[in-house]
Amino acid sequence: MSSVCLAAGDKYVPVRIDENDIYSGVLKLLKNIRPNWAQGKIKLKTLTDGITNKLVSCQFLDLNDEKEIMLVRIYGNKTDLFIDRTAEIRNIKTLNVLGLAPKVYGVFENGLAYQYYPGSTLDVESVTNDNIWPLVATQMAKMHRVQLGRDVPKEPFVWDKIEQFLSLIPDPFTSEEKQARFANSFTSITKLRIEYERLKSHLIKTTSPVVFAHNDLLLGNVIYNKDEGTISFIDYEYAAYCYQAFDIANHFNEFVGLSIEDIDYDRYPCEEFQLMWIKVYLATYLKVDHPSDAQISQVYTEVQQLALLSHFLWGIWSLVQFEHSDIDFDFGRYAEIRLNRYYELKDKIFKQLS
């Protein structure tokens, strides 16, 4: 639908930031990509929104402008096992040309430095604000209209990604406590693999179009700039071609929250809200003033089905993180929440698809 874009090059800095001494590593990085910043005038702040990576904001105090802040992302432990960092940077730089992603300032051995977007991340209250959600729907539609170069795989990424995650679940877990929790909640990896094959046999039939999607629009990855009335997306680790309805459903699944103690499925958006959201989305995606009721209904149906796929993907992902991540987050419990939700919904969805 849009012109094909190719990513530009980027600056590589041969620095590896130690997770136990992050600030020293960040300052060493800044000497290379911001040599004019006096080290004594740099303010560093660790941000806490993410559950995959560690993030540090860097501000040169002589420049009293939020737009001059730089973010440094240090990749989470072992995340290179399942995230294609070359593709991630290519995607960010390509989307930046279109005004859909931040500028990359530099890449280092275990992370990247990129542009800060002024504003605030969404939360369970603001995501349904009438001034905000239409901006999110429109921004997603703009992204879904992007076409990448011929070298980028156009098949839905989600099936290969789930298979990759399944292959990375340890058998057994290195900790006896973790293995016991896994066995108690999920029995075995074999059972999960069988469930995956059943899920795929049903959902592979979806008629949802394949688009270039973000695939991880949790609330912390959406920035709202109230002063400018704009929405920006960040963190393109999982950006790839996938089903249109998967990206929408995945975003709706995040309305319930991410903090383990606060997840509440009563916050999941009702049918009326979803239909309004999809209508706004389709107006931009299809470039029409008034999408038809049939078009809206079709996407709504596909979203309900592919919400199931989102739960399974992130449940399996969380089991991999349960073994490897050193982020302070209960990935074992999160896997239980997402996969339990999957099992609650699957019979109804499978019946619809039969």
Indicate residue ranges for each PLM-predicted region:
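Juxta-kinase regulatory segment immediately upstream of eukaryotic protein kinase catalytic domains
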Residues: 1-45
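ATP-binding pocket architecture of kinase catalytic cores
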Residues: 45-191, 202-209, 227-228
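Short proline/glycine- and basic residue-enriched helix-capping loop/turn segments at helix->loop/beta transitions
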Residues: 192-196
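Catalytic-loop of the protein kinase fold
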Residues: 212-214, 219
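Catalytic activation segment of kinase domains across protein kinase-like and atypical kinase folds
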Residues: 220-259
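Active-site activation/catalytic loop segments of kinase-like enzymes and analogous catalytic loops
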Residues: 245-290, 308-326
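Helical subdomain adjoining the active site within ATP-dependent kinase catalytic cores
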Residues: 290-354
